[in-house]
Amino acid sequence: MPESLRRLSSLVAALSPREHGFAYFDPDAAQAQWRAQQHRVQRSQKLRRSRGYGRLSGWIIPAKDLSDVAGMPTTLGNRSRTYMATETDPFLLSCLRQGAIIPGKTLAPELGLTAYTEPVGLPHPDNPTLPGHTPGGSSGGAAVMVARGLVRAAHASDGGGSIRIPAACTGIVGYKPPHDTGNANPVAQGFLAGTLTDSAYVNNVTVPARVPRLRVGVLIEPVHAEVEVSEHMLSAVDRAASALSKAGHDVMMVRRPYGDAPFAAFHDILSLRSVKVPGEASPLVSWLRDRGSRIGEHRKEAVITEFMSVKSQVLRAWDVDVLLSPMLAFDPPPIGYFRAMSPESDFYAQTQWTPWATMFNMAGLGALVFPFENIRTPIHVGALRVSPAQLFGVAATLYGDSDRRITL
């Protein structure tokens, strides 16, 4: 067993699932993956092939428990839905082929449909940077183990902020890559990482030494809900905007880019995607499923059209290259805060907490969250007219030493 796996096993054994974030941990399977990779490398060397170790060799990358890994159980965030996977999700299979080791599955809420991580019949992970409070969701288990330093990066997915929200809650780095929004698909696969350097590496992005002068739009107005944004979140954005201005970028304030129709469409899309969920479900998932079953064909066509128009609406509204905004309207609330509400109130309260995130899922644009100055002041930068490399370059201007972990 490599030393990195031995270290991880020792750390996990000393922690509870609430602390380490694993829904399932299998060091024996991880060791078998490592041995298979070593065999492939040796075979390549014997055949004198130029490629031996993959780009992710040496990286331990746990999988989010909404995606399958052959030979491991998948719960989909509800113990009663558990099944044994016989195939591996294509994104994770790509990671394995690049040399990554997947030692287990990370805790996630039921079907990834909440911005907090409180799965049914499974432990609710605790925020290591703010004990007793949510680490966000839906990639909450992944965020916990990265923030605690168990792994450098973990697989995550983002269908409405589910990479970026946990990153913001736990003081780490989360990048939602640009993705295909065909048929109103809001979901992108990606990673959570402990540093900006690690995030760039696992996302295969080369951070430029410098970026050209860019137009940076600053948005502090909540887009998808009415909420009073905490002063420390606004102040962080203001200081970040000043830093970008001093770095030579053109910085300007922008307003909300559209009215209520896009988020109403997103709400309906989530509901429609929940219609085929079988069996008993959590109150929120049941509510979305029931709501989706009442949406007619005419409305379905209209919401898909509205969803698919968000990118053009955003680009038409803002003549800027990069968008800077808060990520959270206020600090992570206590575990159980949202779940104690009625499903409808729960959904709206989550939107008030994260009123900017979903715009980038509907637009299919890349967006990056990282702590600015300290872990209580995460900021969000989105790529409107720049490449992923340029977006990371902007972040590097604000992040400072890209290899450092930002702490309290």
Tell where the protein language model's regions lie, with residue ranges.
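Flexible, acidic active-site loops/lids enriched in D/E/S/T/G that coordinate Mg2+ and/or position polar
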Residues: Q31-L56, T82-A85, T114-P135, S139
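Short glycine/serine-rich loop segments
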Residues: E87-N203, G366-P378
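Enzymes and membrane/adaptor proteins characterized by extended Gly/Ser/Thr/Asp/Glu-rich
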Residues: R55-F91
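Hydrophobic/aromatic ligand-binding patch that stacks against planar heteroaromatic rings
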Residues: S94, A143-M145, A243, T358-N361
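A short acidic, glycine-rich active-site loop
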Residues: S80-T86, T129-H133, P343-P355
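ATP-grasp fold ATP-binding core
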Residues: L47-A70, I102-K105, L323-M327
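Short, well-ordered beta-strand elements
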Residues: I375-G393
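Amidase signature
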Residues: M1-R51, V205-T354, M362, G400-L408
